[in-house]
Curated annotation (Swiss-Prot):
It is found in: Cell inner membrane. The lineage of its organism: Bacteria, Pseudomonadati, Pseudomonadota, Gammaproteobacteria, Alteromonadales. Its main location: membrane. Belongs to the UbiA prenyltransferase family. Protoheme IX farnesyltransferase subfamily. This is Protoheme IX farnesyltransferase 2. It comes from Shewanella woodyi (strain ATCC 51908 / MS32).
Length: 289
């Protein structure tokens, strides 16, 4: 109901963003409350998404056994539980972090639940693009919980994780093609075909690789992060290019691209948490508490 895999992935990225900004000076209470608060917000969004998607979930093999589809738990109960999680999560962020971190969490939540889940996912091929923003919010929340401002580092993180979401999501859409087609969800492989989807995967990975390199180039991380970025990005890009081989098994290839995406973003989150650099940066935006 609350998608623990998604929560775990966001936990890793928010921790990476937090430790990147903390630069070795960690406020343990702030870190734990940021992680807990954001995890509850993400869980809330996932629960509301399940309520909204119950009609299309019933048409998909992967999701037809969700409790909101089977009726094991009433939609009303899931709705109340999800809203309660969100209220507690936002409350923790409001009490322990700052206005910038809270603002990003609120915007990400509204984009995911209000714009993506309610409309874009069902009606537009650009739904994945809109959803990528909300998926990129957790590391920025972690980062801004420490800094209290939007600086170049925060912008790079937002771009980096937004770009990562695209090939990651397209890979899922390819190996779950039958499910998305059955539910008439206009993801890129269904709406525009596999050739277009493969091209977009390669292009997004290439741009993601360049943007990831901006963290060390801008002085936020060191040579170790750059090495991890180059190694994982080239590996991921190489796997994506295999999609153009003759007689390729698209489902197997897409699962490999998906697996590479998980390894890549996990490695980068760990690397930026450990290979931080001290940077004097002029904030782009600051909200006074």
């Amino acid at each position: 109901m609350i998608k623990p895999g998604i929560i775990m992935g966001n936990l890793i990225s928010v921790t990476g963003g937090f430790l990147l900004a903390a630069k070795g000076s960690v406020d343990l209470t702030l870190m734990l409350m940021t992680i807990l608060g954001l995890s509850l917000v993400v869980a809330s969004g996932c629960g509301l998404n399940n309520c909204i998607d119950r009609d299309i979930d019933a048409k998909m093999q992967r999701t037809r056994n969700r409790v909101t589809v089977t009726g094991e738990i009433s939609v009303y109960s899931v709705l109340v539980f999800s809203l309660a999680l969100g209220l507690i999560g936002f409350g923790l962020l409001a009490i322990f972090t700052n206005k910038i971190a809270l603002l990003f969490a609120v915007i990400g939540y509204l984009v995911y639940v209000g714009i993506y889940s309610l409309y874009m996912k069902r009606h537009s091929v650009y739904g994945t693009l809109i959803g990528s923003f909300s998926g990129a919010v957790p590391p920025v929340v972690g980062y801004c919980a420490v800094t209290g401002e939007i600086d170049t580092g925060a912008v790079i993180l937002l771009l980096m994780f937004s770009l990562w979401q695209m090939p990651h999501s397209y890979a899922i859409a390819i190996f779950r093609y039958k499910d998305y087609a059955a539910a008439k969800i206009p993801v890129l492989p269904v709406a525009k075909g596999m050739t277009r989807a493969k091209l977009h995967i390669v292009l997004y990975i290439a741009v993601f690789s360049l943007v990831s390199a901006l963290l060390p180039l801008a002085g936020y991380t060191g040579i170790a992060f750059m090495a991890v970025t180059c190694a994982t990005s080239l590996w991921w890009l190489g796997m994506a290019l295999k999609g153009y081989q003759r007689d390729i098994n698209l489902n197997q290839w897409a699962r490999q691209v998906f697996g590479c995406s998980i390894v890549t973003i996990t490695a980068l989150s760990i690397a930026m948490a450990m290979d931080f650099q001290l940077v004097v940066q002029t904030p782009l935006l600051t909200l006074s508490n």
